[in-house]
Protein backbone atom coordinates (compact mmCIF):
# COMPACT_ATOMS: atom_id res chain seq x y z
CA UNK A 1 0.00 0.00 0.00
CA UNK A 2 1.25 3.47 -0.93
CA UNK A 3 -0.34 6.77 0.09
CA UNK A 4 -0.91 8.85 -3.06
CA UNK A 5 -2.38 12.20 -4.01
CA UNK A 6 -5.82 12.19 -5.63
CA UNK A 7 -6.96 15.16 -7.72
CA UNK A 8 -10.05 16.12 -9.67
CA UNK A 9 -11.54 18.73 -11.98
CA UNK A 10 -10.97 21.67 -9.59
CA UNK A 11 -7.40 20.68 -8.72
CA UNK A 12 -4.32 22.71 -9.63
CA UNK A 13 -1.71 21.24 -11.96
CA UNK A 14 0.79 19.16 -9.97
CA UNK A 15 3.94 17.86 -11.65
CA UNK A 16 5.75 16.78 -8.48
CA UNK A 17 5.34 16.62 -4.71
CA UNK A 18 7.09 20.00 -4.51
CA UNK A 19 4.08 21.52 -6.28
CA UNK A 20 2.05 20.76 -3.15
CA UNK A 21 3.93 23.56 -1.35
CA UNK A 22 1.42 26.28 -0.48
CA UNK A 23 -1.58 24.18 -1.59
CA UNK A 24 -4.63 23.31 0.49
CA UNK A 25 -4.99 19.58 1.21
CA UNK A 26 -8.03 18.14 2.99
CA UNK A 27 -7.34 15.35 5.49
CA UNK A 28 -8.71 13.62 8.61
CA UNK A 29 -6.54 14.30 11.66
CA UNK A 30 -6.73 10.65 12.77
CA UNK A 31 -5.46 9.28 9.45
CA UNK A 32 -1.95 8.14 8.59
CA UNK A 33 -2.23 10.58 5.68
CA UNK A 34 -2.09 13.46 8.17
CA UNK A 35 1.22 12.17 9.51
CA UNK A 36 2.65 11.82 6.00
CA UNK A 37 1.50 15.32 5.03
CA UNK A 38 2.95 16.76 8.26
CA UNK A 39 6.27 15.08 7.46
CA UNK A 40 6.21 16.64 3.97
CA UNK A 41 5.42 20.04 5.52
CA UNK A 42 8.51 19.72 7.75
CA UNK A 43 10.55 19.03 4.61
CA UNK A 44 9.05 22.10 2.89
CA UNK A 45 9.85 24.21 5.96
CA UNK A 46 13.46 22.99 5.91
CA UNK A 47 13.73 23.92 2.23
CA UNK A 48 12.25 27.37 2.83
CA UNK A 49 9.11 26.54 0.82
CA UNK A 50 5.58 27.43 1.92
CA UNK A 51 3.86 24.67 3.85
CA UNK A 52 0.67 23.04 2.66
CA UNK A 53 -2.49 24.20 4.37
CA UNK A 54 -3.82 21.02 5.98
CA UNK A 55 -7.57 21.53 6.26
CA UNK A 56 -9.13 19.06 8.68
CA UNK A 57 -12.35 17.36 7.62
CA UNK A 58 -14.86 15.72 9.98
CA UNK A 59 -13.75 12.31 11.22
CA UNK A 60 -17.06 10.88 9.97
CA UNK A 61 -15.95 11.41 6.36
CA UNK A 62 -14.51 8.25 4.82
CA UNK A 63 -11.91 8.23 2.05
CA UNK A 64 -14.67 7.30 -0.39
CA UNK A 65 -16.72 10.35 0.64
CA UNK A 66 -13.72 12.60 0.12
CA UNK A 67 -12.97 11.08 -3.30
CA UNK A 68 -16.58 11.76 -4.28
CA UNK A 69 -16.13 15.37 -3.14
CA UNK A 70 -12.93 15.68 -5.19
CA UNK A 71 -14.77 14.28 -8.20
CA UNK A 72 -17.41 17.01 -8.07
CA UNK A 73 -14.91 19.78 -7.34
CA UNK A 74 -15.74 20.43 -3.67
CA UNK A 75 -12.23 19.41 -2.60
CA UNK A 76 -9.09 19.92 -4.68
CA UNK A 77 -6.43 17.64 -3.21
CA UNK A 78 -6.59 14.64 -0.87
CA UNK A 79 -4.37 11.67 -0.05
CA UNK A 80 -5.65 8.07 -0.18
CA UNK A 81 -4.16 4.57 -0.27
CA UNK A 82 -3.28 3.65 -3.86
CA UNK A 83 -5.44 0.52 -4.02
CA UNK A 84 -8.50 2.42 -2.82
CA UNK A 85 -7.93 5.31 -5.24
CA UNK A 86 -7.53 2.94 -8.20
CA UNK A 87 -10.64 0.99 -7.23
CA UNK A 88 -12.81 4.10 -6.87
CA UNK A 89 -11.40 5.76 -10.00
CA UNK A 90 -13.30 3.09 -11.92
CA UNK A 91 -16.54 4.37 -10.36
CA UNK A 92 -15.79 8.08 -10.04
CA UNK A 93 -14.63 9.06 -13.51
CA UNK A 94 -13.51 12.57 -12.58
CA UNK A 95 -10.99 11.66 -9.90
CA UNK A 96 -7.38 11.16 -10.87
CA UNK A 97 -5.19 8.90 -8.70
CA UNK A 98 -1.63 10.19 -8.88
CA UNK A 99 0.77 7.29 -8.18
CA UNK A 100 3.55 9.62 -9.39
CA UNK A 101 2.83 11.73 -6.28
CA UNK A 102 3.44 9.17 -3.53
CA UNK A 103 3.75 10.31 0.07
CA UNK A 104 4.82 6.97 1.50
CA UNK A 105 6.95 3.97 0.71
CA UNK A 106 5.15 0.72 -0.14
CA UNK A 107 3.91 -1.12 2.94
CA UNK A 108 1.72 -4.11 3.71
CA UNK A 109 -1.71 -4.30 5.28
CA UNK A 110 -3.09 -7.42 6.88
CA UNK A 111 -6.10 -8.88 8.61
CA UNK A 112 -6.00 -9.56 12.35
CA UNK A 113 -8.57 -11.72 14.09
CA UNK A 114 -9.03 -13.69 17.29
CA UNK A 115 -6.85 -16.75 17.82
CA UNK A 116 -8.71 -20.03 17.59
CA UNK A 117 -11.03 -18.92 14.76
CA UNK A 118 -10.30 -21.58 12.12
CA UNK A 119 -13.50 -20.98 10.14
CA UNK A 120 -12.85 -17.26 9.91
CA UNK A 121 -9.19 -17.88 9.01
CA UNK A 122 -10.20 -20.31 6.28
CA UNK A 123 -12.80 -17.93 4.86
CA UNK A 124 -10.42 -14.95 4.93
CA UNK A 125 -7.50 -16.89 3.43
CA UNK A 126 -9.68 -18.43 0.71
CA UNK A 127 -11.01 -15.00 -0.21
CA UNK A 128 -7.49 -13.49 -0.18
CA UNK A 129 -6.19 -16.19 -2.49
CA UNK A 130 -8.93 -15.36 -5.02
CA UNK A 131 -7.46 -11.88 -5.56
CA UNK A 132 -4.43 -11.31 -7.74
CA UNK A 133 -1.43 -9.93 -5.79
CA UNK A 134 -1.18 -6.11 -5.61
CA UNK A 135 -4.63 -5.63 -7.15
CA UNK A 136 -8.28 -5.43 -6.21
CA UNK A 137 -9.23 -7.72 -9.08
CA UNK A 138 -10.14 -11.40 -8.87
CA UNK A 139 -7.57 -13.79 -10.35
CA UNK A 140 -10.30 -15.14 -12.61
CA UNK A 141 -13.49 -13.39 -13.67
CA UNK A 142 -16.35 -14.08 -11.30
CA UNK A 143 -19.70 -14.76 -13.01
CA UNK A 144 -22.17 -11.97 -12.44
CA UNK A 145 -19.67 -9.51 -10.98
CA UNK A 146 -18.81 -7.79 -14.25
CA UNK A 147 -15.10 -7.89 -13.42
Label every model-predicted segment.
Residues 1-147:
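Proline/Glycine/Serine-rich low-complexity intrinsically disordered segments
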Amino acid sequence: VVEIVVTGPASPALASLEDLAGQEVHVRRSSSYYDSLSRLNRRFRGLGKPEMKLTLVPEALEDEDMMDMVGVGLLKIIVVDDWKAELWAGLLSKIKPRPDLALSEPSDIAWAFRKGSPKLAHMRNTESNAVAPNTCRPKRPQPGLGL
